[in-house]
């Protein structure tokens, strides 16, 4: 078995975050990642698409984190951006937005589902997430910047969603949510923090390796991929 490849699929660069793509990608590579997804919020996109630095050993994937409270408008944004990004995230935080995201198979990841006194998920939404293969994110940054009761509440919400994910076989993605270079943590540190949140070692490892790779494979199909509605004919069947 080869060495696992680690990915951080929620990183924000200027003008959304504090650092440039080059600065973030250089540090992420130094920390041991094989790739990151640039996922600026949709209301803080740069005027022009920055060049995404990539090599054979490290890649910056094009992504977006959609911010929209109206479910109908959210679906419109999903349709607008889906074909142009590798990673499409919805910023949750209300029951209506969470439901709209988890019921849409074109969404890759739901971030920040919690709201008020709710973890943001329930049995119905967890089933939708599993059926539509929408992953739930576990973001490290809020834990690093919180103390006292707020951190207790964050951990409680994470563990509640983790229980639902286990019960209904929902995919998890472990990300930094970095708004600056100071928010990035090495894969080993991230895995250790995930275990503090209640993830088993194999669950945390899958959330930072296997699930991100599956998202990219789904959105960047290889030459053998057959698009829906296209029939493959065997030799001699062309008449």
Curated annotation (Swiss-Prot):
| Name of the protein described by the UniProt record | Ribonuclease P protein component 3
Q: Which SUPFAM superfamilies match?
A: PHP domain-like
NCBIfam families in the record, alphabetically? Answer: RNaseP3Mthb (NF046111)
Q: What InterPro entries does the record tag this protein with?
A: Pol/histidinol_Pase-like, RNase_P_comp-3_arc, RNase_P_p30
Q: Where in the cell is it found?
A: Cytoplasm
Q: What class of enzyme is it?
A: hydrolase
How does it associate, per the subunit comment?
Consists of a catalytic RNA component and at least 4-5 protein subunits.
- Molecular function (GO) terms listed? ribonuclease P activity; RNA binding
What is any one of the record's Gene Ontology cellular component terms? Answer: cytoplasm
Q: Which family, according to the similarity comment?
A: Belongs to the eukaryotic/archaeal RNase P protein component 3 family.
In UniProt terms, what function does this protein have?
Part of ribonuclease P, a protein complex that generates mature tRNA molecules by cleaving their 5'-ends.
Which reactions is this enzyme annotated as catalysing?
Endonucleolytic cleavage of RNA, removing 5'-extranucleotides from tRNA precursor
Disulfide feature: none
According to its UniProt record, the EC number is 3.1.26.5
One of the GO BP terms on file = tRNA 5'-leader removal
Its primary localisation, in coarse terms, equals cytoplasm
Q: Which keywords has UniProt assigned to this entry?
A: Cytoplasm, Endonuclease, Hydrolase, Nuclease, tRNA processing
């Amino acid at each position: 078995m080869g060495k696992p490849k680690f990915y951080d699929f929620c990183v924000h660069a200027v003008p959304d975050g504090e650092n440039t793509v080059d600065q973030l990608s250089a540090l992420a590579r130094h920390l041991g990642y094989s790739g990151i997804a640039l996922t600026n919020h949709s209301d803080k996109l740069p005027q022009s698409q920055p060049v995404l630095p990539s090599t054979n050993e490290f890649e910056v994937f094009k992504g977006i984190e959609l911010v929209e409270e109206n479910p109908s408008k959210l679906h419109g944004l999903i349709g607008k951006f889906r074909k142009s990004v590798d990673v499409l995230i919805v910023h949750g935080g209300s029951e209506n937005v969470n439901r709209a995201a988890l019921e849409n198979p074109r969404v890759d990841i739901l971030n920040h589902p919690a709201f008020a006194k709710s973890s943001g998920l329930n049995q119905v939404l967890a089933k939708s997430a599993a059926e539509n293969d929408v992953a739930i994110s576990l973001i490290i940054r809020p834990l690093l910047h919180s103390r006292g009761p707020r951190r207790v509440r964050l951990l409680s919400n994470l563990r509640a969603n983790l229980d639902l994910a286990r019960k209904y076989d929902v995919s998890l993605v472990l990300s930094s949510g970095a708004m600056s270079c100071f928010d990035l943590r090495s894969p080993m540190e991230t895995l250790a923090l995930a275990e503090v949140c209640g993830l088993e070692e194999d669950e945390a490892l899958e959330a930072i390796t296997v699930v991100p790779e599956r998202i990219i494979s789904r959105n960047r199909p290889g030459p053998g991929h057959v698009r829906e509605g296209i029939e493959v004919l065997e030799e001699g069947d062309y008449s």
